[in-house]
């Protein structure tokens, strides 16, 4: 488990949970939840894979358009943001429960991912130089390769950069202060002049963007996209956030804690796999870890209330 290659594999998975966890942290701080992140990962992977492999066919014009990787990246991130905005608008404007809204979009996203390909997989995704759509594998490239050291996954570097930015935004900007205030006491935040609806929509948009980014990264890592990619990943993201000390009741949380939580979940997942623990028992253990983390959070809040 402590070999260089094993640790780098853990870093890859930590980046997946961590980037999802960054968006999830913002959402949970406001007192919400986003169960749709895993489905967005799968949907974006299928859209990007289809655009690279098949392009976009305009039947009325009899032509097929192929997009560059930067264009595909932008398109997919925008799709993730739109899904997040829809979630946020239904929650903030229509006053629907976050659990119900994101549960619904979770099923919609997964269904659309399967409809996109008829349940099939896009495999050996690389693009073609002649079509100008190569380069998707750069999401799975490595940096700082020296001698026998294979290099650090670019996804891990991306995770750390996003974590630093997200931590700064949360602690040093009005937006961060506002979402902490909303999670602490929404009524008081509204009375103080904070635009509650706008900020709630924005945190879900950020969560959608993070999910879309992981959809692209995952597709590059396996050079394929499957409609069920990302299934239950929302649980890993939530576990990382809760283990990092973010309160499910809202108003309390840090990005640094989520980074630590992502490493814990990554080590638990990969450690159990390498030790031969079955997938079924892994789910049981992760579920117990989440419950324990929530119990500790509740215990701490009860102590503070006394």
Language-model-derived ranges and their functions:
Residues 1-56, 89-96, 245-255, 288:
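Single transmembrane alpha-helix segments in multi-pass membrane proteins
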């Amino acid at each position: 488990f402590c070999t260089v290659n094993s640790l780098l594999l853990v870093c890859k998975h930590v980046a997946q949970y961590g980037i999802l966890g960054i968006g999830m942290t913002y959402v949970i701080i406001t007192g919400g939840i986003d169960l749709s992140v895993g489905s967005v990962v799968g949907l974006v992977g299928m859209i990007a894979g289809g655009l690279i492999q098949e392009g976009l066919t305009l039947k009325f014009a009899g032509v097929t358009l192929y997009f560059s990787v930067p264009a595909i990246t932008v398109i997919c991130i925008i799709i993730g943001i739109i899904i997040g905005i829809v979630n946020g608008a239904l929650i903030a404007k229509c006053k629907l429960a976050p659990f119900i809204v994101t549960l619904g979009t979770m099923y919609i996203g997964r269904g659309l991912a399967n409809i996109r390909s008829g349940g099939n997989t896009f495999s050996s995704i690389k693009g073609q130089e002649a079509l100008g759509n190569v380069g998707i594998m750069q999401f799975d490239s490595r940096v700082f390769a020296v001698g026998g050291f294979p290099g650090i996954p670019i996804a891990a570097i991306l995770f750390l950069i996003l974590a630093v930015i997200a931590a700064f935004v949360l602690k040093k900007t009005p937006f961060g202060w506002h979402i902490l205030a909303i999670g602490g006491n929404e009524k008081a935040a509204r009375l103080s002049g904070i635009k509650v609806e706008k900020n709630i929509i924005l945190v879900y948009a950020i969560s959608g963007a993070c999910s879309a980014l992981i959809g692209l990264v995952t597709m590059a890592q396996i050079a394929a996209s499957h409609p069920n990619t990302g299934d239950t990943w929302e649980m890993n993201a939530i576990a990382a956030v809760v283990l990092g000390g973010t309160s499910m009741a809202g108003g309390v949380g840090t990005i640094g804690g989520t980074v630590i939580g992502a490493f814990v979940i990554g080590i638990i997942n990969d450690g159990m796999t390498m030790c031969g623990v079955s997938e079924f028992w892994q789910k049981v253990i992760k579920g117990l870890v989440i419950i324990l983390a929530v119990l500790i959070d509740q215990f701490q809040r009860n102590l503070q209330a006394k």
